[in-house]
Amino acid sequence: MATFVELSTKAKMPLVGLGTWKSSPGQVKEAVKAAIDAGYRHIDCAYVYHNENEVGEAIQEKIKENAVKREDLFIVSKLWATFFEKSLVKKAFQNTLSDLKLDYLDLYLVHWPQGFQAGNALLPKDNKGKVLLSKSTFLDAWEAMEELVDQGLVKALGISNFNHFQIERLLNKPGLKHKPVTNQIESHPYLTQEKLIQYCQSKGIAVTAYSPLGSPDRPYAKPEDPVVMEIPKIKEIAAKHKKTVAQVLIRFHVQRNVVVIPKSVTPSRIQENLQVFDFQLSEEDMAAILSFNRNWRACDLLDARTEEDYPFHEEY
């Protein structure tokens, strides 16, 4: 079966990529090198992960070793929400590009639909704890990002954490030059996202699933939170296929033609997470996994939930 999705630009995006959120700078370099050695060609990055410099070092070392060519890699990064002012977009992008030590990106995403006040704080708040928004919106940021495509610095643009109303606003923007090719969203058995995935795919927008394993290592996890990796029925499906739970959770997305970016810094797991193209989940398996949906999010940025353009109040 295909190991990539074809984007609306005709570029091929590998279905499984390495996620780097929560990978500490000390570990992420070795993780990226192990991933490239294991056959990964898609690396998902972001300014806000504070580790793009090390990711870039790993990519450069592998290119120098002739382990991989730049044109065979698919490198993604994201514009953080404090850089929506047009004058700031290019600076933020150049920071990312120089940290990654590349001369172009394959895909550049708007990381979050709300614009936050520019400055050093990633989530700026007033003294009452209220999140401070920017006067600039994702539509302003998009115009500046389109210039990066026109200049040959980025091959394609996308979005992340957008609901379908926000996507409609972008698609209907007067003078839109470059359509979003992908929407990167949280998805796993407790957040199956069927309606949003169907909507995106119907518009020619590929979907990438982040936190496919339920983000068990998120720093703010509460003891009562559900644990995706511990669902007995999914353990049963994994045993039946002689696969790990993680492999089943990754395969679940691959079979929906959804790109998936599991994060790991452990070489054996990094390898294992790519070994999902040699088995098939049955219709019953897929239906069983989908049945666990409860619209539970590991990543909800609740601090911003009372502000305009918060994406998760809508059904999809």
Swiss-Prot record:
<keyword id="KW-0560">Oxidoreductase</keyword>
<protein>
    <recommendedName>
        <fullName>Aldo-keto reductase family 1 member B7</fullName>
        <ecNumber>1.1.1.21</ecNumber>
    </recommendedName>
</protein>
<dbReference type="GO" id="GO:0004032">
    <property type="term" value="F:aldose reductase (NADPH) activity"/>
</dbReference>
<feature type="binding site">
    <location>
        <begin position="160"/>
        <end position="161"/>
    </location>
    <ligand>
        <name>NADP(+)</name>
    </ligand>
</feature>
<feature type="binding site">
    <location>
        <begin position="210"/>
        <end position="215"/>
    </location>
    <ligand>
        <name>NADP(+)</name>
    </ligand>
</feature>
<keyword id="KW-0521">NADP</keyword>
<comment type="similarity">
    <text>Belongs to the aldo/keto reductase family.</text>
</comment>
<feature type="site" description="Lowers pKa of active site Tyr">
    <location>
        <position position="78"/>
    </location>
</feature>
<dbReference type="InterPro" id="IPR020471">
    <property type="entry name" value="AKR"/>
</dbReference>
<feature type="binding site">
    <location>
        <position position="44"/>
    </location>
    <ligand>
        <name>NADP(+)</name>
    </ligand>
</feature>
<keyword id="KW-0963">Cytoplasm</keyword>
<dbReference type="Pfam" id="PF00248">
    <property type="entry name" value="Aldo_ket_red"/>
</dbReference>
<dbReference type="GO" id="GO:0006629">
    <property type="term" value="P:lipid metabolic process"/>
</dbReference>
<dbReference type="InterPro" id="IPR018170">
    <property type="entry name" value="Aldo/ket_reductase_CS"/>
</dbReference>
<dbReference type="GO" id="GO:0036130">
    <property type="term" value="F:prostaglandin H2 endoperoxidase reductase activity"/>
</dbReference>
<feature type="binding site">
    <location>
        <position position="273"/>
    </location>
    <ligand>
        <name>NADP(+)</name>
    </ligand>
</feature>
<comment type="subunit">
    <text>Monomer.</text>
</comment>
<feature type="binding site">
    <location>
        <begin position="20"/>
        <end position="21"/>
    </location>
    <ligand>
        <name>NADP(+)</name>
    </ligand>
</feature>
<feature type="binding site">
    <location>
        <position position="111"/>
    </location>
    <ligand>
        <name>substrate</name>
    </ligand>
</feature>
<dbReference type="InterPro" id="IPR023210">
    <property type="entry name" value="NADP_OxRdtase_dom"/>
</dbReference>
<feature type="binding site">
    <location>
        <position position="184"/>
    </location>
    <ligand>
        <name>NADP(+)</name>
    </ligand>
</feature>
<comment type="function">
    <text>Reduces a broad range of aliphatic and aromatic aldehydes to the corresponding alcohols. Reduces prostaglandins. May play a role in the metabolism of xenobiotic aromatic aldehydes.</text>
</comment>
<dbReference type="InterPro" id="IPR036812">
    <property type="entry name" value="NADP_OxRdtase_dom_sf"/>
</dbReference>
<feature type="binding site">
    <location>
        <begin position="263"/>
        <end position="269"/>
    </location>
    <ligand>
        <name>NADP(+)</name>
    </ligand>
</feature>
<dbReference type="GO" id="GO:0005739">
    <property type="term" value="C:mitochondrion"/>
</dbReference>
<feature type="active site" description="Proton donor">
    <location>
        <position position="49"/>
    </location>
</feature>
